[in-house]
């Protein structure tokens, strides 16, 4: 088993499975999202996972502007030239359990090798895990990497209507990227 598979099995899979169990409907589909606390719970779960990754030069902060859905900014200082922004989201669309195949449920992580089934695992819960693990593996290999900033929102499935005020408010923190990578498979 290579190192990325080890991290997937021992670290990402358990956390991503917990993420699947959080309904976390996007604000358009759950008007009481703030009271429900599920969007915040997805960010908190991901931050707990980040804490255990041993990534050098990493910091993160959850942001909340007024009544807007929360945004997480993760910054990993570069050891080489360049700046990259990685975009991802943690909110989900409503699901209809009756439309799922036998033995599957949107809020229950099911592993059928090599696939993991559950709402939000592909669109788009994996994004932050992928980015952070990629940088972790580069660091473990002693390879230089650019400054990496992740912006992870919780309103994408509603059309990202909460994102523009954050982009404006966090403009300095987001830096001057050479590249923007959108980690959204649209699954």
Residue ranges: model-predicted function:
Residues 1-119, 138-145:
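Acidic/His- and Gly-rich active-site-bordering loop/insert found
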Residues 120-187:
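Acidic/histidine-rich catalytic neighborhood of metal-dependent amide-processing enzymes
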């Amino acid at each position: 088993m290579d190192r990325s598979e080890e991290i997937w099995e021992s670290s990402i899979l358990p956390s991503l499975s917990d993420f699947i169990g959080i309904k976390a409907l996007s604000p358009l589909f759950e008007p009481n999202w703030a009271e429900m606390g599920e969007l915040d719970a997805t960010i908190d779960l991901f931050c707990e996972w980040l804490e255990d990754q041993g990534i050098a030069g990493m910091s993160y902060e959850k942001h909340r502007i007024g009544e807007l859905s929360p945004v997480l900014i993760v910054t990993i200082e570069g050891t080489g030239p360049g700046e990259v922004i990685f975009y991802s989201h943690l909110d989900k669309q409503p699901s209809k359990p009756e439309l799922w195949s036998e033995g599957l449920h949107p809020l229950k992580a099911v592993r059928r090798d090599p696939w993991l089934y559950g709402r939000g695992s592909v669109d788009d819960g994996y994004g932050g895990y992928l980015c952070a693990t990629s940088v972790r593996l580069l660091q473990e290999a002693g390879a230089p990497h650019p400054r990496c900033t992740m912006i992870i929102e919780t309103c994408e499935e509603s059309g990202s209507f909460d994102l523009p005020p954050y982009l404006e408010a966090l403009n300095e923190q987001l830096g001057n990227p050479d590249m923007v990578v959108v980690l959204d498979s649209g699954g």
